């Protein structure tokens, strides 16, 4: 799911990022490079901000994030903070988010790059408050899907655009 960023600058969409992805990260060196690679598509690099929020990892999580920050400075940024748990990393990312929308993707998860590209292109055209999406659980060792979750929000008609006041 992604949500509209209410602190985003209204009316100044020229240089604004469309989407901020907050990547909470704590000791995810085994997965982080795959996570970050999944956001890379030349059609959308200027539209996406990826904030890797390092929760004081003790492995090479920060170094992996910094390597993406150096290679793609217009898209990736590492924020290192005192260890405070998963929720505190999300909160810090939201505080720093510059995109019109934000989404959380944990440091041991990834997105389908082509579907992500389509999502970002769609967000450039629409003005919505919340977007829900399907997801699949994948076994990290075998890389095989274990469960696909379609229509994760019960009670909503899919294929419609809802305003935030309709769902909250």
Which residue ranges define each predicted feature?
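Nucleotide-sugar donor-binding/catalytic module of glycosyltransferases
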Residues: 4-168
């Amino acid at each position: 799911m992604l949500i509209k960023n209410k602190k985003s600058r209204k009316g100044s969409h020229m240089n604004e990022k469309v989407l901020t992805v907050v990547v909470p990260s704590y000791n995810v060196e085994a997965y982080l490079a795959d996570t970050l690679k999944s956001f890379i598509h030349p059609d959308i690099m200027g539209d996406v901000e990826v904030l890797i929020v390092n929760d004081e990892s003790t492995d090479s999580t920060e170094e992996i994030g910094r390597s993406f920050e150096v290679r793609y400075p217009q898209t990736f940024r590492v924020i290192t903070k005192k260890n405070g748990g998963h929720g505190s990393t999300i909160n810090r990312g939201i505080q720093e988010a510059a995109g019109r929308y934000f989404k959380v993707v944990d440091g041991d998860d990834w997105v389908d790059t082509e579907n992500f590209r389509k999502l970002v292109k769609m967000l450039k055209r629409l003005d919505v408050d919340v977007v829900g999406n399907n997801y699949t659980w994948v076994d990290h060792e075998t890389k095989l899907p274990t469960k696909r979750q379609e229509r994760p929000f019960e009670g909503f008609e899919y294929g419609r655009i809802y305003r935030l006041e309709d769902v909250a």
